Amino acid sequence: MYTKNDIMQMVEDEDVEFIRLQFTDIFGNMKNVAITSSQLEKALDNRCMFDGSSIEGFVRIEESDMYLHPDLDTFTIFPWRPQQGKVARIICDIYRPDGTPFEGDPRYVLQKVIKQAEDMGYVFDVGPECEFFLFNTDDNGCPTTDTTEKAGYFEMGPNDHGENARRDMVLTLEDMGFEIEASHHEASPGQHEIDFRYEPAMHAADNIMTFKLAVKTIAKRHGMHATFMPKPKSGVSGSGMHINMSLRKDGKNIFADENDKFGLSQDAYYFIGGLMKHIYEMTAITNPLVNSYKRLVSGFEAPLHITWSVRNRSPLIRIPSAVGGGTRIELRSPDCAANPYLTIALCLAAGLDGMKNKITPPENIQKNIFSMSEEEKAERNIKSLPTNLSDAVEAMEQDAFIQDVLGEHISNVYINSKKDEWDRYCRAVTQWEVDEYLDKF
């Protein structure tokens, strides 16, 4: 735990000249206010103000004053910036002038759900698996969807053209305090994954935001563009953000039970039941873009069906083979376009709801779901996730549980914005339509 004096001393000792006060908007976009070291004490006293009306989804212009409250434990120095006059960052919570937390701050939403878990004696650990593409840029440095490689799963150089960039990403992340467990080339040409160690929920969400910034920054230094867009190209696997979850109580993983045939405790089953009950209505948050649903299609290992399994990778929820302290629940539908604070908050809230109300999940599915007929899926009562953003938003709009977790402000802003996004998509004339119809009609 850092103190104010710790931060002031580190800034002086490390020759830090600029500090970025970072925060995240409702839609998962990172924002910042940059200050010089001369203004740091003011910022650490929670006296740094910004115009909230300028941030999409925050507040109206007549109530725009907002204050940034730095979370001191998020202080880190950017390794890629100059080593004289260094640049550091601190992630901030957003408060109103009257000293109350701003209900539109995604971090505040997660804090509230974490508090519920803590009141029950639990620590929620989260380990994300973030996938991304590295593409070439054009002569002007603008991103393209072009890649000159044809590499697939676990390939290495020289076939993996992003190997050097990925190595530098790993080294940079380690300099920033990440514990990197593995990195590798993914299934599609130009696609990569870097896995970092699980952390308590808030730290994990902060890490996802930091991870995306670092990956994009290092890619640019290698003359490439990193994108977390779920499905940037047709005909290849999209990029997901699998969420691995476990609960600890008194230092012990409460999901583990060595006497169960699958190694799962009753609370783990209830947690799975809660996730399965709420996932359809959560999907507008976990998969927030029109493009997200082009990843969630058959033929590319993406989960479509609301089922669970042990080891089998075709269902929505998977129980990896690790046992004991490593026992965890893996939710496979989210993608990296999702706001990690809202996504993790909903995962925890849904799981706790399952535990509180003893929601028993259906029988697990060991068979490859993609090989099942529609009749067999109907017989087993296997339901599917929403197939498009419109259906997902409609489900969210009708669900009181999701809106209660997110709060009225975020729910209303998010739903209205996503309705507008869908409407703009429906009105757009795409290149596919031009290619398909122009010379036929």
What residue ranges belong to the model's regions?
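Glycine-rich, acidic/polar active-site loops that bind/position phosphate-bearing ligands
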Residues: 1-441
